[in-house]
Amino acid sequence: MAAFTEIRPHVVVIPFPAQGHINPLLKLAKLLHSRGFYITFVNTEYNHHRLTRSRGPGWATAGLDGFRFETIPDGLPPPSDENSTQDVPALCASTRATCLAPFRDLMARLSRAADVPPVTGIVSDGAMGFTVDEDFGVPVLLFFTHSACGCWSYCHIGELVRRGYTPLKDESFLTNGYLDTPIDWIVGLENIRLRDLPSFVRTTDSDDVMLSIMVRSAAHDAPHAAGIILNTFDDLDGPMLDGIRSKFPNLSTPSAPSRPSPSSSSPRSPVTFGRKIPSARRDDGVVGGYFQSTY
């Protein structure tokens, strides 16, 4: 086991606990695993129990060698319907407020475990940016599961607040034509209207949870992460990625990766995540990639 732990990079992957976030993070985790990484995938206890009821006992330990599941609480009381979808704003607020401590405890347990390689990196959902608030001694990358256009839009939520576009004065602004206000100052999105931006801007609440989280994500979480992962590349989303770089000048992205051949016989050796990253910040912080559907 000593030789195993010395050579195999170990990435902890933590998605936001909603289906549209779990699936992309799980896909990325499986792709990393196929390239030689040891993976710890972190679910919330509530979602893990739902998966166990759906797929049967032992599902989390069956199948892939070097791919394990761990759980942390989400901080919410269990709903009366054990299969119900949780309220997203409440879940966002709760994970931000309560998940760092149990995640820290999990990282400590992994560091003491003799049967797993040392953790060499963390890939966190962009909506779980509390992971950048702690010095875990390894790079923390944020994976934003929405499009590059969505990411670039989120980067401007704070400026929309500062310029007075949002929160709305009252609910009449939802129907009086105000949402058709042109927003012509976002580079790459010059011909959009307020209604075309993420729906969080339509709130009338100055303390809106989702609005606050989006502002913090762009102002604090992304700049403090080792990098940002987007499922795209320059040839596809060049203007949006140029905009993201202008917001975070320490970040860049590689050119479009070539699509792997299904019959490729290239060795599945570990790539450079974790093992060759000397600190928690790199110049090439935005990572673009092609996610082939192989699982």
Predicted regions, residues:
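Glycosyltransferase specificity loop/lid
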Residues: 1-295
